[in-house]
Swiss-Prot record:
Residues 1150-1158 are annotated as: Transactivation domain 2 (TAD2). Transmembrane segments: none annotated. Residues 1074-1132 are annotated as: Required for macropage invasion. Its main location: nucleus. Residues 1-22, 117-149, 206-227, 287-311, 518-655, 704-741, 1017-1048, 1192-1213 are annotated as: Disordered. This is Protein Atossa. Residues 564-578 have a biased composition (Polar residues). Belongs to the ATOS family. Residues 717-731 have a biased composition (Acidic residues). The gene is atos. It comes from Drosophila melanogaster (Fruit fly).
Amino acid sequence: MIPTSVTNSPPPAGLGQNGASASLGSATAAAGGGMLSGLGMVAVSGCGSAGTGAQNNYGSVVLGLASLILEGRPIADDEYQQQTVGVVGSGAATAGSGGGRLSPRPSTSRAAINITTNPYGSMGGSENRAVNGSGSTGSPSSSSLTHQRWTQKLCQLRQISPAAQTMSAEPELVSLAINDLNKDHGDYEIVRRVMLNRAGGTGLVSSAGGGTNNSSAASSPGSNSSDNILHSLQSLATTCLRGGPALAPPPSVESRPLNLAFHWSGLGGSGGRGLGFGGGAASISNTPTTTATATASSGASSSASRPKHGPHCDQFLRKMGLAKGEMPSEAEEHICDMSYVNMTCNRWRAYCMKMEAILARREPVCIEVYLGPVSHKLLLEQWIICGREKVPPPTMTLPSLCSAIRSQLYFSQIVAWCDLLRKCDPSVYDSGRVIFSNCGNNAGDLATSYTTCGGQKRPRLNIFYRIKQHTTTNSNSGLHQEDGFSAKANVHNFPNVNVSESYSISVSVRSLPRINGGLPHVEPLPPSPAPRSLRPCGGDPASTPTGGGGLHAATPTGLGARTSALTPTTTAGGSNCDNGKPGMGQILDELDGDTSLSHRERQLQKYRKRMQRRDKKRERKATPDRLNSRQQSEEPMDEGEESQTQSQTTSETQSLALTLQQPRRIAMISTGTQTSLSSCQQCGSEKTLLCLSCTGGGGAHGGSNGTANGSTNGATDDGDDSDTTASEMEETSSCSLSSADLIVGTPRNNAELLLQAIQRTPKNRNRKPHPGVLDQVSCRNADLNGGQNNNLLKATPATSGCQVCKRQKTQHNFANGKVHQPTNGKQASNGYASMHLEAEKQPDVVQILATKLTPNIERCSLNPVERCKTPPPGVADHIVVQFKTPLSQVPAKHQPDAMVPLQQQQLGKSSSKPAQLRLNCGSNLLESETPPPMTSPQMRKALPKVNLTTIFCSSAPIAIGCPAFSFDPAALSHARSQLLAPDVSVTPPVQKSFSAPTLPHAASLSVSPRFSKQALAAHKRRSRHLSDRSDRSSLGSDEQLSDEDLESGLCSPAGGSPLKCRARLAAQFGGRPLLGNLEESLLQRRLMPKIEVMGFTLQLGASGGFCPTQVNIPAVSYFYELHGETLSTPYLCEIRLPRKGYSVPRSGTVQATLLNPIGTVVRMFVIPYDMRDMPPLHRTFIRQRILAEELSQDQDEGHKVPRSPTVTSTTSKLGHFISAEQMKRLRYSIHLKFQTSRSGRLCLHTDIRLLISRRTDCDTAAAHAKGVLEAPNELVTDTMMPAEPRYSARQESAGRI
């Protein structure tokens, strides 16, 4: 039955079912409160008053939709399959003397006996006292036909054809164990039981309807039409979930366990001694039977509500519209017949108890659909049902919402996988995600004389659900991470549906994208076809509390599967293998099912899992002595350890449980007594991270993390699986800066875990550095500043390279000359411990704290013992700046000791990865950092290839003094004048290629003039053309833009600070004098623009002897503002062409259409040309102007300017330079550049520039002011070409083309 009582606190867990001997659901409300009858949900207010009707309707709709999501998917078809049952053992007896019921009750079955020994139940004992309370007087009926009809109705709900499979005619028995040890809401373990037939196994025992007036056999089969299905869905969410009003119960005697909040109405057969085991229901109690009033709370037992129906009985099907017949009275009490209670009833009861507390708090319900097994679960769907205040009118009704949900369920990937399973696809069976039914020693087997393997149920998908409270998070990044999806989930929000006048319900589903290639496989594959069975301890056959060998998930739900690891395996003698400790699977399942964990904690747990996996990979490469010590420390932990799956090893389970759930407890290994790690092993003084009283090195066991290894010949305490050794703690202690991990029994707080996750610190290992490296470190520390050591972290060498800052290209090392701490090169000490020790000894010294972001930096620096430091405030004496360069042989430092690794690197093979340039700037180190004479020429040769744009072009001043480069005010002013020189300011000194020289100003860096001239010419030549990878059909891609465009920002979105944008525009447009008129100055980029606008597009095409492909090229527009001008200024559009240009016929027409950012045509230019006489390797240009010509009354017709757009004469009427008056009439202008190749191919090259005047609106306004409908002028086209010479030779030689 469905429990209907809801209190303010979650109900205590217990063991009991509804059926022949016990009826769950007759319960009292807490503290004398009223009760709203919903399907498993009653909202009780604090004062005990009944909720409003809207709340009742909301709860009914939520549970109705939840039942549709949970039970409407055709994945549990094997519940209705025909099963061949062997010969029944002699223990199968019937007891029906009390109420005339002839239900089989296997009193000697293992399942019935072992239920009483459930350690999770609060009741023990071997007797069940069932009392005939309601006097069942139902007449016997054909149970097989009724069960087949109910099965058919449920198949209709799940859209399964009954003819597609063999329907079972056997009722089912289900035992439900509730675990309340570690959960507030309890957890449920459902194990399926099949009733035994009588001898022969063909017919079923006729049984009477256990409920009062249960006329299930008299109802006729329902219709299978779509309208009836739709009507049933509407009824499911509205009316069928409400029960009738509570009436006074009939006089009955009820057995009430001591710790249960529910009353158990005895409805079973005889009152004699026996098992009330009917329909998956059992009321087990070791206490004498008491009356209902004996333990009634606040005298409310007399107002107990009637048991409600579930999705398994005939009355439910009638209300859904799937069964026709007269509706029984709402006032009568309905109790399902125990013979027909199947798995669906009890599973739905468990689901309702899951949702009970969530709905009582008015919280959203989240239903997660997983693909098992639990150890390798994969989140497939996440359904969220929440109520909210009424929103604007909805676009979907409740029946439509139910239909949409059914469509979503039916066309999901789970159904597709089920089809593969029905087709016996071998890839599905080999995936490890299929539940098989074995012949013997399973949880579903009963204690018969023998069992048969024939007629077993078909395998099915390991699909299980989890119902929890939905918690909303503020983080928008990594959705598939924060919700448990392995990939970015597809989100579908159904329209809101109003359930009352002021309240609506919202349903959304997040699903994993479709997985191609069938079922995802479990790696590694499980060795046995039963991936969820528990391993027997010591080889002895273990028995679970519900009978059988290992727990086996026989339902598509995850309730049985998730709690299988929660049941401790017991031997025949009753002793527990793991000494009473819960299994590791329980800890992991608690983590998985704990809804109180916040998003941040879940992210931290995932991070810790990744750290553990990475460390286990490293442990395979550990030294032999470390391997021996770890093997000795982990050997005693393998005994008696139960695993959640056979593919998951004990060490993995232990490490996960140790890291994620339980506080750190360290089992010290020593030859004598155990000592706590909170005290030093050498002197016994109390310490946190490092003993502050010891000053010695401590030998090899001093450790790089300040923890003592101790001797490794002892044994760990095998009584605690969560203990770890000191050597193992040494591997993990560097993951956090706090010392709480090393204190015995101290749990981590959230702030500490968050700090660790932010830092992303890899674990330090106790590496044994090379003696030569240590000597080099000691020599370097001794030579630098006369024995001064500014960075204690230099003492630990890095042998494996930087593991975190892989993308770091700049390292700033700030050191303070006030700290004096000599170090011993032979001692490998932890940097933090040394700093802590130094802080204790010198409290008056400014402490330099390291971020520990890069504990081992090799690829970030040529000096392998340097570490990143956070710059302390006010420290600018010694600044080290690194820049990424394309050279691998750049000198590392301007000091003698840095030349040693450089010379070794130059003698050997060159490194493939780029090195870094280190500029040591400090006035107090000039003497020691002067380069020796022998290395100065090498440095000078390498300097021209170094990209110093960050130094020279940086907007922020660098107030440092460098021995290699002088940054005094005179030099800075000279460098500024050189940067703003007219001859080189057009081409910025930035280049992406590593093959050509980068600095056009190489002459100022002691480079020969010839080399500088060649470099500057190559730079101009490269920056003028685009890449060779251009494609004429798609010129808008970034890879086809030139280096100059990418770095100057011409073709990039206008972003960045206004100061940087202004400086870039000044470098491109400023510095050159103006030309004859405004048109030339704008076209030749001699004026400084006011603003730069992106998004313009030019459609370029041509026609003639052939028609080239029309292309779309992005354009950049520059707007100007001239002071003192009353009229608006034209704006310039510039379009960069590809390197090879745009090939056109020798004679024809070029059509260019300019589009603004919103896609509207600004102007279409049609330029005719004829260049058939143009020789190869020559160039020319065409400029077309479009002007507004005003017609005067006395103007002679013969002196009008030609208006034909086909004017191709080289002698323009306007000339090359137009006057100021003509400039006022200029509306559009386009400038095209033509050139021919060595083979005579004609093409447009370099760029196209357009001038667009914005006076069209002014012309229209002037026309309307004069009362004229049309504009008082016409547009006149004027085309111009050079006259003498018409074509000019190209500057490049023929060999370069």
